[in-house]
Amino acid sequence: MQEHGFEEVPGSKLNYDMSVRYGISRDQVKKLIRIFNESAAIGFLPALRDSMYYVKRLHEELGYRFHCITSLSLDPNAQRLREMNLAKLFGPTAFERVVCLDTGAHKDDALEEYEGAGCVWVEDKPENAEAGFRVGLNCLLIEHGHNMHYYHDHVRIVKNWRGIYELITS
């Protein structure tokens, strides 16, 4: 955001709400997120922490296949860039399915088809982790600055993909 002229409000670095973090309207935030999500940058997102190593291990050594549900965009070019980025980072077969919802959309409806499946659901947004819990998924929340004080009886906080790997394989 700084490269586009937006300065962070002092003391707001850990706030998930970008309108608070940058002192701009929610409408402007939505527009900026959509612009970013539909840009070429989506094809070059870096992997989070140790995810490349542990996702590959889960997939290649243990046969896990991943489904990604992302509130990216309905734009087909953005969707394709995201799929290409995931394949580049994790290999061509780790992600069996990528579901792209509209920018900022809630994931409740998309998660309904997994109801009762008992799958592991990895999230970074507490509201989406809770949506996974409501349909019976085993919810893991990756810790970030914006969610590090979150607590829910049925959502386990993990610091990284090593923690996820250890939970799954123990």
Task: Name every feature range the model reports, one short phrase each.
Residues 11, 48-51, 78-83, 104, ...:
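A structural signal for well-ordered alpha-helical scaffolds and beta->alpha junctions
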